[in-house]
Amino acid sequence: MDIKLKDFEGPLDLLLHLVSKYQVDIYDVPITEVIEQYLAYVATLQAMKLEVTGEYMVMASQLMLIKSRKLLPKVADNAELEDDLEQDLLSQIEEYRRFKLLGEKMSLQHDDRALYYSKPKLELVYEDAELLHDKSTIDLFLAFSKVIAKKQEEFSKSHTTIVRDEYKIEDMMEVVRQRCAGKSRLALQEIFAETKDMNEVITLFLATLELVKVQEVQVIQEENFGNIYLVGRGNE
């Protein structure tokens, strides 16, 4: 399965999505939390051996610099540089937001004008059918990053060293179906309760994403940053 960041037009688009979840002015967001979520998302993709393009890694480096400076003792010069870096980042996100809104407005105007022409509007079909059609799927990845961290700690304390490679997504899809069956909803972390190694954890998550993609499983998050639940088809 090929999972990429193509639903986001770049790292600023990803950051804008994270910032917008706070529902406050961009300059009022807790920037450290946003940075941690961005880094957790990218780290999760890397742990799953998925493609992360260079521009996302460049932004990750910049965010790590801002985060590291915020952890340093407050010195006048350092504090000023830290504020400059943070304000520059927020300004970039705000500028990107304005351009994106303008682009969406122009797109709507184009669609309105198309109604006045007899010639049928050309429909563009993109061949890249990506998994992340809904950007809220990023919340799944953010929740999964916590699962990975917990499981890595759990496995590191275990004396079991056998790692299997033969897990199949199709088999794990059936596991998720069975665990969702008969329940009104299932907390995401419950799916991974009995996993034995990291390969199983990752394959199980990919299976969950595939079930979401084919609409066999619905994702529910009742509030921003809240727990994520899975609802099987027929249990809505």
UniProtKB/Swiss-Prot annotation:
Localization in the cell: Cytoplasm
Gene3D superfamilies: 6.10.250.2410, Structural maintenance of chromosome 1. Chain E
Keywords: Cell cycle, Cell division, Chromosome partition, Cytoplasm
Major location (coarse): cytoplasm
BP GO terms, sorted: cell division; chromosome segregation; DNA replication
Gene Ontology CC entries for this record: cytoplasm
Family matches, as Pfam families: SMC_ScpA
Description of how the protein assembles with itself and partners: Component of a cohesin-like complex composed of ScpA, ScpB and the Smc homodimer, in which ScpA and ScpB bind to the head domain of Smc. The presence of the three proteins is required for the association of the complex with DNA.
Family label: Belongs to the ScpA family.
HAMAP family associated with the record: ScpA
Task performed by this protein: Participates in chromosomal partition during cell division. May act via the formation of a condensin-like complex containing Smc and ScpB that pull DNA away from mid-cell into both cell halves.
Cited NCBIfam families: PRK00104.1-2
Entry-linked PANTHER family: SEGREGATION AND CONDENSATION PROTEIN A
Name of the protein in question: Segregation and condensation protein A
